[in-house]
Amino acid sequence: MNEVTRTNQVDKDFSKLTFKLSKHKTKKDKKYEDVSKFSTLHEAVNGNLQNFEMKKSKLQNGANTKKSDEKLKQLEEEEINYLLDTIPFIKEYDNKETVKETTDEQNTIFQIKSKNTNTNTFRKYLFHVEKINNNTTLDAVTERETIDQIFTCTCGGQMEVWITSTQSDLVCNECGLTQPYIETYTGKESNEGMAYKRINHLAECLNALQGKEGTNVPHEVVDAVKAEFKKNRISTTSEIKPSKVKQYLKKLGYSMYYENIFTIANMISGIPTLKLSRELEKRFKDMFYEIQEPFFRHKPPKRKNFLSYNYVLYKFAELLGEDDLLQYFPLLKCSKNLHNQDVIWKKICADLQWQYIETV
């Protein structure tokens, strides 16, 4: 085949594809719905592909008529179009699920996995492909452009959120740069939507506190932190605190394990991991939900971040008489900031008719 013939064939193929796409675009748009029957991207893709196969099998096993052939062809085109629409989200999901490997000077390999970003990918898929229109999917597709700037490191790497008990940090997956991550919101974002996000964050905090992060810590990391305690002549269990573990992880370049500070502290001290009863954990979450509206009502107009999660859980434990848990929720060291939180908390307690206990 000469060059001219090849070029003509390419042009013809391109014209056919363009025509098919134009037909696809002129089809009646699928109506938006409120709720999806799927809970994950994997489940959605598998479910839809199985549905296509069942429909095609039914047509193939039925009477072979011109009408059935046309329906089968149309169904195959719909399946192709579905895959074309879905592939970008599958790629985005897979990229976020890919295990990243970092090697230190001794060629020790540690596996790091981002756990917080794929939910957003699934929500965007639901909005664009499944046509699910609700608060969570809308929130996913209307993210501000500044979010991309926040989650991009100066070295070009991606900054990922790591939950450490009741605190979040942004950690670069390339150079390891760490910086505090403060959850903020604007007037455009609904209080209900932010409450949903905060409750999810609270659940992650409680999981981290109980060593239920779902991430295994390599023995090399635990041994390195243990060596730091030994170097600093810290041996008593009361001195092996999560805050110290975090300090040593940062020094050793293991900031990606911030979410495991309680687990590591327990592994070194030999103290069993804290376990909250289901009833108490549910009570914490219920109380947390109850304070959302009063907080929004009483927060200073210029305040953009929520109360410290440590502070909130400390107050919950205090109210419920769970004094043995107070040690797990270290409060802010700055008395002024602590007082500012007390001012808001006092108004929240008044609204909910809870007992107010002054912190400072």
Swiss-Prot record:
Pfam families assigned: A2L_zn_ribbon, Pox_VLTF3
unnamed zinc finger locations on the chain: 153-175
Top-rank taxon, per record: Viruses
Keywords: Metal-binding, Transcription, Transcription regulation, Zinc, Zinc-finger
A GO term, aspect molecular function: zinc ion binding
GO BP annotations listed: regulation of viral transcription
Keyword Metal-binding recorded: yes
Matching InterPro entries: Poxvirus_VLTF3, VLTF-3_Zn_ribbon
Function recorded in the entry: Putative transcription factor.
Family label: Belongs to the nucleo-cytoplasmic large DNA viruses (NCLDVs) VLTF-3 family.
Descriptive protein name: Putative transcription factor B663R
Species per Swiss-Prot/TrEMBL record: Paramecium bursaria Chlorella virus NY2A
